[in-house]
């Protein structure tokens, strides 16, 4: 089977590309390299022994995207390509709606115009739920008005995909609503490349641990949680990429037409910021320098997944530990430091 991976050199995309190749899929990667690096392509080859076809393309360039589809027949598409900074989206909402929504619309239009049976996996987010009234969050939780343009872009993209599939029997699709992916490949050849000040907690932790940051700032300790810090559902990147492949395999066996559904992807366990820091310290035998700062605008109190739907429907389960994820994240940070020193 031939699979197109958009944003395939990014954090989740690169790990999924490795998993697909190892599973015997033929893949083509497209990426505009805004939040990734071409060196990732070489490292995918080092891990798998195979260099996938790659095209530097911005999905907003519809003509360039059409060329890829003219020269390939894809059985499936996994769509990661998107900007993902919540704070940046608040400062520049037009960029996020253009980049994320327009890109998805172009991709769906071209897939639809080909008239070929295509299975689509969309990289969505638990941000569509906002601060859910009930925890853990299941898929019947309402999709709310979004506080950030990033969240709004994910919500709109899901709607675009669903509306197209309802009327097009040639496309089946699944949106995967991730919680908080962490960790890196065990080879330390690919991982999360945080540009500037990290928005995600784990790169902030590892950069503080290695000395790139003077200290780690915890954004608030006065939340109504067991230790006053925010609660999130952290999932090992290894488990997340297996969810994509499992979803793709599920669709490939699907006899129905016009099939669309969405699934939470998490562990089902909520961990506070302070608990995650303690696990990192214990796992890697490191003491972190951290202090309590003010709350960060837009942060919700708690979010963790009810995963029964994906467990029962697709047969996917999270299996890897948070400790292992934090160990691989730390090894990745040390590898990055060596590369920078050289």
Name what the model sees in each region.
Residues 1-184:
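N-terminal Rossmann-like NAD(P)+-binding domain of SDR-like oxidoreductases, especially those catalyzing
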Residues 2-4, 94-95, 148, 192-193, ...:
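Short, contiguous strand/loop micro-motifs
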Residues 39-42, 63, 94, 199, ...:
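Generic alpha-helical secondary structure signal
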Residues 97, 147-155, 191-199, 203, ...:
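Short-chain dehydrogenase/reductase
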Residues 112, 192-197, 298, 317:
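A general boundary/transition motif marking the beginning of the first structured unit of a protein
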Residues 183-185, 222-223:
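Short, basic/glycine-rich phosphate-binding loops at helix/coil junctions
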Residues 187-189:
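Catalytic core of nucleotidyl cyclases, primarily class III adenylyl/guanylyl cyclases
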Residues 201-342:
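C-terminal substrate-binding subdomain of Rossmann-fold SDR/epimerase-dehydratase oxidoreductases
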């Amino acid at each position: 089977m031939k699979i197109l991976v958009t944003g395939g050199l990014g954090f989740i995309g690169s790990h999924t590309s490795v998993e697909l190749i190892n599973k015997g899929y033929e893949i083509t990667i497209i990426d505009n390299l805004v939040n990734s690096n071409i060196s990732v392509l070489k490292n995918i080859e080092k891990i798998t022994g195979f260099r996938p076809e790659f095209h530097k393309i911005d999905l907003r360039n519809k003509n360039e995207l059409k060329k890829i589809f003219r020269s390939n027949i894809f059985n499936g598409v996994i769509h990661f390509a998107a900007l993902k900074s919540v704070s940046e989206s608040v400062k520049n909402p037009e960029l996020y709606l253009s980049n994320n929504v327009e890109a998805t619309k172009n991709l769906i239009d071209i897939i639809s115009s080909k008239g070929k049976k295509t299975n689509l996996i969309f990289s969505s987010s638990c941000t569509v739920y906002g601060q859910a009234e009930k925890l853990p969050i299941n898929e019947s939780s309402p999709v709310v008005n979004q506080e950030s343009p990033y969240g709004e872009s994910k919500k709109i993209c899901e709607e675009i995909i669903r509306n197209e599939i309802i009327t097009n029997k040639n496309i089946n699709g699944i949106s995967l609503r991730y919680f908080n992916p962490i960790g890196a490949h065990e080879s330390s050849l690919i991982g999360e490349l945080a540009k500037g000040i990290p928005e995600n907690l784990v790169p902030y932790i590892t950069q503080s641990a290695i000395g790139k940051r003077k200290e780690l700032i915890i954004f608030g300790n006065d939340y109504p949680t067991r230790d006053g810090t925010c609660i999130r559902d952290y999932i090992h990147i290894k488990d997340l990429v297996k969810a994509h492949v499992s979803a793709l395999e599920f669709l490939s066996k699907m006899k129905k037409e016009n099939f669309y559904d969405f699934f939470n992807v998490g562990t089902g366990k909520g961990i506070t910021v302070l608990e995650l820091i303690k696990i990192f310290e214990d796992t890697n035998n490191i003491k972190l320098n951290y202090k309590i700062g003010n709350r960060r605008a837009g942060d919700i109190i708690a979010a963790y997944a009810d995963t029964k739907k994906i467990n029962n429907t697709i047969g996917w389960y999270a299996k890897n530990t948070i400790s292992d994820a934090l160990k691989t994240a730390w090894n990745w940070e040390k590898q990055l430091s060596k590369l920078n020193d050289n």
